[in-house]
Swiss-Prot record:
Keywords: Electron transport, Membrane, Mitochondrion, Mitochondrion inner membrane, NAD, Respiratory chain, Translocase, Transmembrane, Transmembrane helix, Transport, Ubiquinone. InterPro entries: Complex_I_Subunit_2, NADH_DH_su2_C, NADH_UbQ_OxRdtase_chain2, ND/Mrp_TM. Belongs to the complex I subunit 2 family. GO terms for biological process: mitochondrial electron transport, NADH to ubiquinone. Core subunit of respiratory chain NADH dehydrogenase (Complex I) which is composed of 45 different subunits. Interacts with TMEM242. It comes from Crocidura hildegardeae. This is NADH-ubiquinone oxidoreductase chain 2. It is found in: Mitochondrion inner membrane. PANTHER family: NADH-UBIQUINONE OXIDOREDUCTASE CHAIN 2.
Length: 347
């Protein structure tokens, strides 16, 4: 893809999300989502292949369906309230339809099926945008209407997403699918706390974006897409493989890494609100995520991936100048747990 066209598309994606985040008018919100969707589809298939075309088509159909449901909900709400402002959510049917539309855009269960397939079929750089930036706009809209959302429906979807995010990643060897199921699980944690403390939900989003961006940066740098290629990274640059494994454990929420902080704060907040069964089930389900991350770490660091090929290995990367650039991001993604009291005070 032409670099200038790519920059224009990225600017349009950011503009569409910014319109959604800053708008208080339903039509402008819908328009922002449409701008975002039409700009990201070419980005998903920037490296033309049948697989990327299929992934972009699946993404387009899913997002178009969600936008259609969103517009239907906006019209229903307009009929009952007579206003276009987002703050006026008086109709329960419209509220439920908007929730379903935003859940489809986020890729939460039970509308999660497109996330692993689309992520697997696109380049790593496009996957980074899909699993990080594309979550901000729907979450910002949920933040504005969270008081009007059916709490039981929301919590059910959240718990189901955490469970599916764990179960789905258990038998995966492709790192992009593992990151996709990890995204589904993390979105479940954010949704679970949205009704109780939406600020904490956005703190979780910030930590998730930092960890996911660090992981994708290392995968892009090492051209790693599977467990086999990750295990071979030891022969190229051991520090890359080591940092990748530490970030994977942080994504799994293993203390004392950064990923443990939002889970700790969310469980604490739910317990304060006299909810004990939900955080217990969430913590148990999160062990599934932690299990496949630890298994991936073990198979990569302590064993060699089985292969019958006598392949010639590259012993080092040609260019390591990018490492100092991503080192601060990796440090925050793994060692920010001591900052927890500060976030608790700000919360």
């Amino acid at each position: 893809m032409n670099p200038m066209i790519f920059i224009i598309l990225l600017a349009t994606i950011m503009l569409g999300s910014s319109i959604v985040m800053m708008s208080s008018h339903w039509f402008m919100t819908w328009l922002g989502f449409e701008m975002n969707m039409m700009a990201i589809v070419p980005v998903l298939m920037k490296k033309y292949s049948p697989r990327s075309m299929e992934a972009a088509t699946k993404y387009f159909l899913t997002q178009a369906t969600a936008s259609m449901i969103l517009m239907l909900a906006i019209i229903i709400n307009l009929m009952y309230s007579g206003q276009w402002t987002i703050a006026n959510m008086e109709n329960h049917t419209a509220s439920m339809l908007i929730t379903i539309a935003l859940v489809m855009k986020l890729g939460l269960a039970p509308f999660h099926f497109w996330v692993p397939e689309v992520t697997q079929g696109i380049p790593l750089s496009s996957g980074l945008i899909l699993l990080t930036w594309q979550k901000i706009a729907p979450l910002s809209l949920l933040y504005q209407i969270h008081s009007s959302i059916n709490m039981e429906l929301f919590l059910t979807m959240s718990l189901l997403s955490i469970v599916i995010g764990g179960w789905g990643g258990l038998n995966q060897t492709q790192l992009r699918k593992i990151m996709a199921y990890s995204s589904i699980g993390h979105m479940g944690w954010m949704m679970a706390i949205m009704n109780y403390n939406p600020n904490l939900s956005f703190l979780n989003l910030l930590v998730y974006i930092l960890m996911t961006s660090s992981m994708f940066a290392l995968l892009i740098f090492s051209s790693t897409t599977s467990t086999l290629s990750l295990s071979l990274a030891w022969n190229k640059t051991p520090i890359i493989a080591t940092m990748s494994l530490i970030i994977l454990l942080s994504l799994g929420g293993l203390p004392p890494l950064t990923g443990f902080m939002p889970k700790w704060m969310i469980i604490q907040e739910l317990t304060k609100n006299n909810s004990t069964i939900l955080p217990t089930l969430m913590a148990i389900s999160a062990l599934l995520n932690l299990f496949f991350y630890i298994r991936l770490t073990y198979s990569t660091a302590l064993t060699m991936f089985p292969t019958m090929n006598n392949m010639k290995l590259t012993w080092q990367f040609q260019n390591t100048n990018i490492l100092p650039m991503i080192l601060p991001l990796i440090t925050i993604s793994t060692l920010a747990l001591p900052l927890t009291p500060l976030f608790l005070m700000l919360n």
